[in-house]
Amino acid sequence: MKTFQLTGTPRAEFGKKAAKAIRKEDQIPAVLYGGKGEGVNFIVSQDAVRNLIYSPEIFLVELTVEGSGSYKAILKEIQFHPVTDRIIHIDFLQVTDEKPVVMEVPVVLTGHAEGVKAGGKLSLEMRKLKVKALYSEIPEKLDIDVSDLQLGKTIQVGELHFEGLTLMNAKNAVVCAVKLTRAARGAAVKKQ
């Protein structure tokens, strides 16, 4: 898993008024929890987290909070403003070598599906899968081979197995499918 360096400053004031003042200065209130004791409240700049948030990749965040120390964490939750889509709060989860974490990992389809060769269209239904594992065992992406996928067939979460990972999505959830295109459907009707 790739690492991302992030530095924050401790947060002194709390509440709605203080949070609004922080956001006016292009800063984002954040919290780190999951370690021993209470959570660490801090502030990060909007520019510092842009590459972390707006990326399809997953990162292990090496977080340094001035006066509190350094932590290894993952991005747990991001809250966006419902109208402006600005980031209003970020939650980080501290990770350790012995405690498993749950996070979403991007799905990458490999191979050329048989159904696509027959005129179908490959459709990725789930871009990310929720997995549970030690953070050191979580891969950057989940590769799924679709070479044997026929026209009209799907790959469901229950059919997938990755060593050291537990998939948390519903077993019958469709990850990808080869669907019949309108052109192929029209050609089939004309033959009849």
UniProtKB/Swiss-Prot annotation:
Gene Ontology MF annotations: 5S rRNA binding; structural constituent of ribosome
Cross-referenced InterPro entries: Rbsml_bL25/Gln-tRNA_synth_N, Ribosomal_bL25/Gln-tRNA_synth, Ribosomal_bL25_b-dom, Ribosomal_bL25_C, Ribosomal_bL25_long, Ribosomal_L25_dom, Ribosomal_uL5_bac-type
Alphabetized SUPFAM superfamilies for the sequence: Ribosomal protein L25-like
GO terms (BP aspect): translation
Gene3D superfamilies (UniProt xref): Ribosomal protein L25, beta domain (2.170.120.20), Ribosomal Protein L25, Chain P (2.40.240.10)
Keyword hit for rRNA-binding: yes
Keyword tRNA processing: no
Function of the protein: This is one of the proteins that binds to the 5S RNA in the ribosome where it forms part of the central protuberance.
Subunit structure: Part of the 50S ribosomal subunit; part of the 5S rRNA/L5/L18/L25 subcomplex. Contacts the 5S rRNA. Binds to the 5S rRNA independently of L5 and L18.
UniProt family annotation: Belongs to the bacterial ribosomal protein bL25 family. CTC subfamily.
Name of the molecule in the record: Large ribosomal subunit protein bL25
